[in-house]
């Protein structure tokens, strides 16, 4: 398994079928974006959980496989060499099959498009693991998507928030927009673009330009959280000979890529009608494991799921 939280689930489901697995993760911790980018965020699309944080979800998945699989962190898989009946991974592991579950891939944040000194950079954040670090401060949150809205709501539990977006309309859940508008310690500034940033008396002084208006507006902030999204990169797959559509991997209904023995699941994949939901990815991981079992053991009568009679 190569990749994020779906790799953990796929390893567990593979163990149920008697397969031996290894999970590789290029990061220092397994779990992908939910663990590294927004561990405190409440995830609402997991069946049987009304709401669960990224950290709690990862911990439950890790607990399921703690005695079932080997996890190798801080290891970016570079070379995959096809053999007659399997693959050699980085000259250290032989595997009969591979599942890629890297999500959006290696992610690099889109930065605030301003000239910024090193002193100011210390007050600008692209990752927030603990929003309580902003307690009793005034924090600017830049962005208009789901991540920006989620971050603004979490930070608002501890600080005053100014949510700054270049459009009047947000690209996140309307329910979150309504929540933010109802909070007295949240000010929504739209449609504004940041034009200049300075450090004055240990505070950030941001010059904002309203769309269609020449006059600038200045706001003072203690720190800034930038949620403009991330530049994804799954180009490693191309090196392995896997076809890509932009940054995604096309798969067939069995979750197989264009290479026999290599499968993919989660937000890394693309096919008509797919939506980027964690819950959907769990099902894709199960389909991939089932396909691997049928390929490796065609003579076996396969129990597809735990509720089979």
From Swiss-Prot:
Enzyme class at the top of the EC tree: oxidoreductase
Obligatory cofactor(s): FAD
The protein's assembly and partners: Homodimer.
Binding site for FAD: 25, 33, 38, 77, 107, 267, 307
Keywords of the record: FAD, Flavoprotein, NADP, Oxidoreductase
PANTHER family: THIOREDOXIN REDUCTASE 1-RELATED-RELATED
Pfam families the record matches: Pyr_redox_2 (PF07992)
EC number: 1.18.1.2
Entry protein name: Ferredoxin--NADP reductase
